[in-house]
UniProtKB/Swiss-Prot annotation:
It catalyses: Cleavage of non-reducing alpha-(1->3)-N-acetylgalactosamine residues from human blood group A and AB mucin glycoproteins, Forssman hapten and blood group A lacto series glycolipids; a neolactoside IV(3)-alpha-GalNAc,IV(2)-alpha-Fuc-nLc4Cer(d18:1(4E)) + H2O = a neolactoside IV(2)-alpha-Fuc-nLc4Cer(d18:1(4E)) + N-acetyl-alpha-D-galactosamine; a neolactoside IV(3)-alpha-GalNAc,IV(2)-alpha-Fuc-nLc4Cer(d18:0) + H2O = a neolactoside IV(2)-alpha-Fuc-nLc4Cer(d18:0) + N-acetyl-alpha-D-galactosamine; a globoside IV3GalNAc-Gb4Cer + H2O = N-acetyl-alpha-D-galactosamine + a globoside Gb4Cer. Homodimer. This is Alpha-N-acetylgalactosaminidase. The keyword Disulfide bond applies. It is found in: Lysosome. It comes from Gallus gallus (Chicken). PANTHER family: ALPHA-GALACTOSIDASE/ALPHA-N-ACETYLGALACTOSAMINIDASE, ALPHA-N-ACETYLGALACTOSAMINIDASE. Keywords: Disulfide bond, Glycoprotein, Glycosidase, Hydrolase, Lipid metabolism, Lysosome.
C-alpha cells in the first residue's frame, strides 16, 4: 500500500500470543488485557533500549472492546479494563515516542466474540480509530464469508485513507483464503494493505515455528515477489522470551524472520524477559539487516539431505545476509561449502561478520571453502559486504581493483 508507511517491516510489541484473551483482571491483574498492560509495555519499550532500536508499535489485539457498541453504534473499550479510554492510551503511548495499534475484525464478531466490523460499519469504525489517534489497524477475518472479505478489506483501506490520519493497515485476509493464488490475489493485497498474515497463528512451540518456516519457504516463489517497502508478508509474532523455544531455537526464529523481511512484533512479557532473550531481540546488526531499505525478502537457496538449509537475503550496497540452519537433532554439525557454491560471483572477496558472535572474517574469497558449526535446531548467520571485485582490464597497467557496486 503506497501510503508512505511501513517502508521497512514494522517493529514493536503485540499482546496476543503471550496474553491472549485473558480478561480476568480481578484475579490476574498483571496479565489481563487492560490499559495497565499496554502502559507498562510502553514504559518498557521506551525505557529498556527497545525504542532506539526501532521497536515502536504497541499493538492491542482482541478482547479490548466492550461487549456492545454504544448508543451511536460506535465501538467502545471495556469500561472496567480501559477506564480512561483508547484516546488516553494513545496519548500515553505517543508521549513516549511510540505508536499505537488496535485490533478489529471484519465480520459479525471478533475471533474472541467481541463486536466485529460488518460491512455497514467499516467507515464508522475507521473514523473512530482515527479520532482515537490510532497509528495501525490489524483487521482480522473471523465470522465473515469470502465474499464479505473481498468487499470489506479494500473498503477498509479506502475508509482509513479518507480519515486523513496515517494508519498502517495489517490484513488477515489471505490467511482466511489459504494463503495462495488463485484464491489470494497478492497484486491486489499489495495495493490495499501494508502487511498481511498469510498463514496460521503462531503458538508457543518450536513445531509451530517450523510449520510457518516450512510453509513460507515451500511457497517462496509465490510469496517473495510481493514483499517490499510498504507491503510485507507477515509470518506472525516473535515468541522469543516465552516458554516454548530453547535458546538455539530463539536465535533461529529471529534469524529466519529477518531473512524473510518479516515484521518484528514481539509477544512476550517485557517486564520479566530474560537477559538472553533480550539480547537476541536487541541484536543491532540483526535489526539493521531486517530493516534494510531495499526490503527484499530472502529465500531458501539450499536444502541438504543432511538436514542443513541455507537462506540468502540480498541487501543494499551489494551486501547480503546468509543463514545456515540445522534441523538436526543429534549434535553440532560441521557444514562445509563455499560462496561460489552458494551462487556468489567469482573473483570477489567479502568481509564477513557473524551476526550473533560478532566475529569477523576478512577477505573471504568466493572460491574459498569454509566450515560453519551449526547447533541442533540452531543457526549461524552471516552479514557479508563485498571488499572489491577483481576485474581484468585490457587497459595498460594490468588488473585494477574496482569497488563492487
Amino acid at each position: 500500500l503506497e501510503n508512505g508507511l511501513a517502508r521497512t517491516p514494522p517493529m514493536g510489541w503485540l499482546a496476543w500470543e503471550r496474553f491472549r484473551c485473558n480478561v480476568n483482571c480481578r484475579e490476574d491483574p498483571r496479565q489481563c488485557i487492560s490499559e495497565m498492560l499496554f502502559m507498562e509495555m510502553a514504559d518498557r519499550i521506551a525505557e529498556d533500549g527497545w525504542r532506539e532500536l526501532g521497536y515502536k508499535y504497541i499493538n492491542i489485539d482482541d478482547c479490548w472492546a466492550a461487549k456492545q457498541r454504544d448508543a451511536e453504534g460506535r465501538l467502545v473499550p471495556d469500561p472496567e479494563r480501559f477506564p480512561r479510554g483508547i484516546k488516553a492510551l494513545a496519548d500515553y503511548v505517543h508521549a513516549r515516542g511510540l505508536k499505537l495499534d488496535i485490533y478489529g475484525d471484519l465480520g459479525r464478531l471478533t475471533c474472541g466474540g467481541y463486536p466485529g466490523t460488518t460491512l455497514d460499519r467499516v467507515e464508522q469504525d475507521a473514523q473512530t480509530f482515527a479520532e482515537w489517534g490510532v497509528d495501525m489497524l490489524k483487521l482480522d477475518g473471523c465470522y465473515s464469508s469470502g465474499k464479505e472479505q473481498a468487499q470489506g478489506y479494500p473498503q477498509m483501506a479506502r475508509a482509513l485513507n479518507s480519515t486523513g490520519r496515517p494508519i498502517v493497515y495489517s490484513c488477515s485476509w489471505p490467511a482466511y483464503q489459504g494463503g495462495l493464488p488463485p484464491k489470494v490475489n497478492y497484486t491486489l493485497l499489495g495495493e490495499i494493505c501494508n502487511l498481511w498474515r498469510n498463514y496460521d497463528d503462531i503458538q508457543d512451540s518450536w513445531d509451530s515455528v517450523l510449520s510457518i518456516v516450512d510453509w513460507f519457504f515451500t511457497n517462496q516463489d509465490v510469496l517473495q515477489p510481493f514483499a517490499g517497502p510498504g507491503h510485507w508478508n507477515d509470518p506472525d509474532m516473535l515468541i522469543i522470551g516465552n516458554f516454548g523455544l530453547s535458546y538455539e531455537q530463539s536465535r533461529s526464529q529471529m534469524a529466519l524472520w529477518t531473512i524473510m523481511a518479516a515484521p518484528l512484533l514481539m509477544s512476550t512479557d517485557l517486564r520479566t524477559i530474560s537477559p538472553s532473550a533480550k539480547k537476541i531481540l536487541q541484536n543491532r546488526l540483526m535489526i539493521q539487516i531486517n530493516q534494510d531499505p531495499l526490503g527484499i525478502q530472502g529465500r531458501r537457496i539450499i536444502k541438504e539431505g543432511s538436514h542443513i538449509e541455507v537462506f540468502l537475503r540480498p541487501l543494499s550496497q551489494a551486501a547480503s545476509a546468509l543463514v545456515f540452519f540445522s534441523r538436526r537433532t543429534d549434535m553440532p554439525f560441521r557444514y562445509t561449502t563455499s560462496l561460489a557454491k552458494l551462487g556468489f560471483p567469482m573473483g570477489a572477496a567479502y568481509e564477513v561478520q557473524d551476526v550473533y558472535s560478532g566475529k569477523i572474517i576478512s577477505g573471504l574469497k568466493t572460491g574459498d571453502n569454509f566450515t560453519v558449526i551449526i547447533n541442533p535446531s540452531g543457526v549461524v548467520m552471516w552479514y557479508l559486504c563485498p571488499k572489491a571485485l577483481l576485474i581484468q582490464q585490457q587497459a595498460p597497467g594490468g588488473p585494477s581493483r574496482l569497488p563492487l557496486l
